[in-house]
């Protein structure tokens, strides 16, 4: 009898050890994105801005920022491009953000699918629009796997001041610049929605009414979205409203710092 009891206790201890080991190792395995057997990261929100407001050095500068951040976390083997549109200029056609990122699917740091296709990402059909993509606060992660601090996380009146925000990583910074309409395409060229195609850090002069967040002729501005889907306008992930200007100091006044979406180019671009 004692022998049987002893064997039962030994078996029990082994089972407990296995369960404890599984509980510890399983979450670690989920976090090891890009490891053999895992789902490679193909989408992220930049953890930090370039730092010159809407002047990103054009699309090339934004793409390089995506590539550099991805490389630091071991995801540099993919080709990364920024989800940004540019507006038409004389002799230069517009570029649509949706045409820069391939066909999908895209997964975040944790291997969670954000969208299965361009149509799913943008809600191109009524059915897909009703379904929505899977980009929200818990999935719109940075390349480091962090949630972007949002509207109600750490309330502090100073989070509209760049001097405070730049040294406070948990401050509200849930606006992501896109320069795009909700379908992922560029705006017409008559009003600035892209900080002059990502080359300007200018702010509107005193002649402009800054009480609203809509663009106007001659007014420096950039269109933003919300990865957490919380904020002004329509709460869209990629096209909600404009900003107070294009300088680094102006972006935090509406709770942004110049972060943007990066996608690994999947499939063949359109």
Model-found features: residue ranges?
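Short, low-complexity disordered leader/linker segments with a strong preference
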Residues: 2, 28-33
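Intrinsically disordered, low-complexity regulatory regions of eukaryotic regulatory proteins
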Residues: 2-6, 151-154
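Bacterial N-terminal signal peptides that target proteins for export
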Residues: 4-16
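Short non-domain terminal segments
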Residues: 10, 19, 41-42
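Bacterial N-terminal signal peptides
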Residues: 15-26
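Secreted/extracellular ectodomain signature
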Residues: 32-270
